[in-house]
Amino acid sequence: WADTYNLFDNWIRLNELLALSSYFETYLSCIIGLSFESDPGLLIGSIHSVDGIKLLKDGHTFKKEDFKQRIIDCTRGDWNSRISYMKSTFGSVPQSLIDGRSELDKMRILRNKVGHAFGRDIEKSRNYALTQIHNMETLKTKQFLKYQKMIKKIASDIDQQLMNNHIGNFQPLYHYHLLYPSAVRKLNDGERMMLLKKSIGGDIKETYSKDFCRWVVTYYDQL
């Protein structure tokens, strides 16, 4: 019974690793895509040369194909190549990402074994002449917690870099852009500000001050 329980416990941790890795890659693809939409100059190596909100206001729509391959390059393959693509795109990457690339690659390889071969060596699992099933890879609790801590730190550092340097307040401005057809009919900036504040609170469950919402309205209207 104890052996079976330990195998099950290990299998749970391996699946937690699979989820952790998938969540991290989903986060990366989202925040990198958001950076391109907010700062389209990244696509041509000209940071801050174009305001993404200005493009939207002028009637231009983003085609995901414009930066789909860039996102793929930053989220697939081994971590040396991913980091290289991120450096070429954003100019630099957080030191925590560089320091963690070896562990990230170990995590990537193990994640692939879980996703494609039930936690076993992929190539050996495809050897159909085998007469026995290989044991699953082992992931100790201590190592899994180490991976969790590492991912949290790296995600936080990437978030800070891209939010500060490329994304800024793109999201609330984009939300106002979607509201604009109805907001433009309001008589004054105060009414538009309240419309934005209520919409953000109702749709996104975020709380922004009146002053910030007023700034969003003013910034957008002056573009």
Language model: regions and residue ranges:
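Helix-loop junctions and short alpha-helical segments
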Residues: 1-110
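Charged/polar positions within long, soluble alpha-helices
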Residues: 28-36, 112-123, 156-163
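Polyanionic, low-complexity intrinsically disordered segments
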Residues: 120-223
